[in-house]
Every structure is written in C-alpha cells, then in structure tokens.
Design a protein with these regions (language model features):
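Transmembrane beta-barrel strands of outer-membrane/channel proteins
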Residues: 40-46, 75-79, 88, 133-137, ...
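Residues on the lipid-exposed face of transmembrane beta-strands in outer-membrane beta-barrel proteins
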Residues: 25-31, 60-64, 119-123, 170-174, ...
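Repeated loop/turn-to-beta-strand initiation elements of outer-membrane beta-barrel proteins
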Residues: 35-38, 69-73, 127-131, 178-182, ...
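Residues that define the transmembrane beta-barrel architecture of outer-membrane proteins
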Residues: 19-23, 54-56, 113-117, 162-166, ...
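C-terminal beta-signal and adjacent terminal beta-strands/loops
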Residues: 236, 244-269, 273, 287-292, ...
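Gram-negative outer-membrane beta-barrel transporters
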Residues: 32-37, 135-139, 158-255
Length: 350
C-alpha cells in the first residue's frame, strides 16, 4: 500500500535557480583594565535570497578575576542573526510545491533573530582541580527548524514564532594529578518552541498546525552526563575510560484518531522493529535514557628524533545500548547511534 496521501501526484519534478547573496562586516575590540576583561563588538549582516533583510548585532563579554579566591566571574550577551537553511528552499517556496496536496500552508521563511545570555564562574581548587559553571538563556524569534516532503528524505527549512531555551552546565576538570587526568560534566537544559508557524511548507494535514501553544524543542535533553579518566601507566603507555548518560530527546508521535495508541505502536513495530520501539516511551513522548561506557589505550611504539609512531585502541558503546538518538515525528527523521564498536589507529609524525 502507498504511504502517500491519495491526492499526491505520482510524478513531480522541479528545477529552479536564484542567487544567494549574503554579506557581513564586524568590528571588535579586547580591553584589559586591571582584573577586568571586556570584549565588545558590532556585526552587520545582509541576507538576500527570497527575502531581503539586514541586521545589526551587538555582542559583549565581561569577566572579572578575583586573585584572593582564584575565581573568575563572567557574563556575555550576543545578538544573533541566523539565515534560513538554503536546502530546497526554492522548492518549498514554489507554486509547484503547493500543488502537491490540497490544504497546503506555505509561508516565507525569514531569518532567525535571537538574544543569547550567559553567566558563570570558574574556580581553581588545590592547584589540580578546576570547576566551571554556567547558566544560559536563548530567546529566538522565527525559530528555525526543518520539515520533510511526505515520506521522503527531502527536507526544507521552516520556522516557528519563537523559542525559549535555558539551562545550566558544570564541569569538573583534573588536568594532571599523580598520573591521573580527567573530567566530569553535567548539563541541564529546557527548550520550548512556540506556535504558530511563521515560515515554511506544510503539506495537506500538516497545514492544520495549532496557532497557539508550545512543544519541546528537538534538542530538549534535560540531563546529560559525560566523564572520562586517563591514567599514565608508563612514559609511553596510557589507559582511559569514559561514561556517557543521556535522558533522551523528545519526539512528536502522530496516531490516527481511528486507532488506539497500542494499535498505532504496533504499526510502528512493523516499520522500525521491536528493538527500536522498546527504546521509545510513547506515554511521555521521549526516548528512554541511555548509558554508555567507552575505553581506550595508547602507546608510543617508536620514538626517535625524526619519527614518532603511536598506536591507539578504542572501544565505544561497550554496554552495547541500542542508542536511539531521534525518533520519527512530524518534524524529524530517525537517527540511531553505532552499536558496540572497536577501532585501531596507527599514527606517524615526522
């Protein structure tokens, strides 16, 4: 049976050209005033493809070092002007595309404009330990995303009214301590995109998108942990191990109103397989968390005045988790990370 809407024409071809004209210029200066450091700049952007727009974007970064506490505080602001992806933008903006299905919504895609804020600190402890923490917030108008032509891999840019993304992150570094080095990092983030859509092509039923409300951003991963420890066994030999924990990204699942949720899920099993579906939490609309372990070992196998040869062995995803990164929904495709993998690398420097 066809996966396409019955009203979709069987043949479709499109050819179009248009110059993408973009210019930018910026000035920036770095100022040191005692324990203060200030970086300030101003950028101008011009975008001309299907629309003609200009933007002036200031940026500012301020930091202060407190010698008695071995502490650095910093704050930054950046005004961002992001042009739409040009992938298939002529196709999605064409009259031919609107004839693919009835009830199609087509709007011009304007550049995204955002205000990015960040504040944080960096502090050293016991000479061999460094802690870094940051809080960030990003407010974006005409938030850029991408969509697909029915059940194909053809993608094109779209935009929503706005997005608000905020979170915090911290990292503990041990640069060198009795042959040990490593880090442990944690990040927490929340991202929401807000209706209505303000740009792009939405075929058929996709044109019936809500005019208000919000949904999780495609990168709204609440908790992420990374860690790695390295030990220098000898002057020419080292070993390392790492961990990776992700709480899972959100997805949007469309279930036919004539079917129950379980019937819809069973249909997904036939399409993607039981192993993939077992990694999906349909009740929460998120992929289940994943935990992975990695390990590495390296050695300098030959070293002379003119030549150095090193051998490295890596093992990735040793827990062999079926790592579903993205799951198909209204605005995204599927992505699955590699299974347990091993790599051997021989490098020569001369």
């Amino acid at each position: 049976d066809s996966q396409f809407d019955p009203s979709t024409p069987t043949p479709f071809s499109f050819a179009g050209t248009h110059p993408d004209i973009e210019q930018s210029a910026f000035v920036q200066d770095l100022i040191h005033l005692g324990n203060w450091t200030v970086s300030a700049g101003l950028r101008w952007d011009h975008y001309h493809l299907l629309l003609d727009q200009n933007a002036v974007d200031p940026r500012l970064s301020i930091s202060r070092y407190f010698h008695s506490a071995d502490l650095v505080l910093h704050f930054s602001y950046d005004r961002v002007f992001q042009t739409p992806s040009f992938e298939n933008i002529l196709l999605s903006s064409s009259t031919a595309a609107t004839n693919l299905q009835t009830g199609t919504l087509q709007l011009p895609v304007r550049p995204s404009v955002g205000n990015y804020f960040e504040a944080g600190l960096t502090k050293a402890f016991f000479k061999n330990l460094r802690l870094s923490t940051n809080y960030f917030r990003r407010d974006v108008n005409n938030y850029a995303d991408d969509n697909q032509v029915t059940n194909t891999t053809i993608g094109f840019p779209i935009a929503f009214q706005k997005a608000i993304i905020y979170g915090a992150e911290g990292k503990l570094d041990v640069p060198d301590w009795h042959r040990f080095s490593g880090f442990l990092s944690y990040s927490w983030s929340v991202g929401n995109a807000f209706y209505p859509v303000t740009g792009g092509l939405f075929l058929g039923a996709q044109g019936m998108i809500p005019t208000s409300g919000h949904f999780p951003d495609s990168q709204d991963q609440r908790n992420t942990v990374r860690g790695r420890v390295r030990y220098q066994v000898a002057s020419r030999l080292w070993v390392a191990a790492g961990i990776q924990y992700d709480t899972g990204l959100p997805f949007q699942f469309q279930c036919d109103s004539r079917l129950t949720l379980q019937q819809c899920i069973q249909g997904e099993v036939q399409t993607y397989g039981q192993q993939v579906i077992d990694r999906i939490n349909f009740n929460l609309g998120r992929i289940y968390p994943s935990f992975q372990v990695s390990a590495s070992a390296g050695a300098d196998v030959y070293k002379s005045e003119h030549l150095k040869m090193s051998l490295q062995i890596d093992g990735q995803n040793l827990t062999n988790v079926l790592d579903v990164i993205d799951f198909g929904g209204l605005f995204s495709g599927n992505a699955i990370g590699p299974p347990r993998s091993y790599f051997v690398r021989l490098a020569a420097t001369f």
